[in-house]
Amino acid sequence: MFTRVVELTSKPRKSRELSSLINDKIVPILKKQAGFVDEIVLVSDADSDRVLALSFWKTREDAERYQRGQYNSVRETLQPVLETEPVVRTFEVHTSTGHKIASGKAA
């Protein structure tokens, strides 16, 4: 399993609107992508304008296909409420209590 962690900084006091946009506009797009597993959105309790969006994918290839195909459109949808450009980092999932993982890969 593979994860994309997207670090977002909303305009001041826009994190709730950003979270709503992700839930209402972006999650439906993600659900249509091959290999998409889950999306988790975290809002910092120390800095409410900082948001992490974690998307989980069956394989690195699935995540990369999304990056090449849909991500620019998604970023444009979020742009009006963002203070800075999103920062994307990727990780291989090795342990999860919520998803089946076998030898560092989705079961």
Regions found by a protein language model. Give the residues of each.
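An amphipathic, aromatic/His-enriched active-site/gating alpha helix that lines ligand/cofactor pockets
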Residues: D24-K25, I29-V37, F56-T90
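A short alpha-helix capping/helix-coil boundary motif
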Residues: R4-E7, F56-W57
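Short, surface-exposed ligand-recognition loops at beta-strand->loop->(often short) alpha-helix junctions
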Residues: T9-I22
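Short, charged/polar surface micro-motifs in flexible loops or helix N-caps
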Residues: P12-R13, D47-S48, K58-A63
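Glycine-rich beta-strand-turn "strand-cap" elements at beta-sheet edges
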Residues: F2, T9, I40-D49, E76-A107
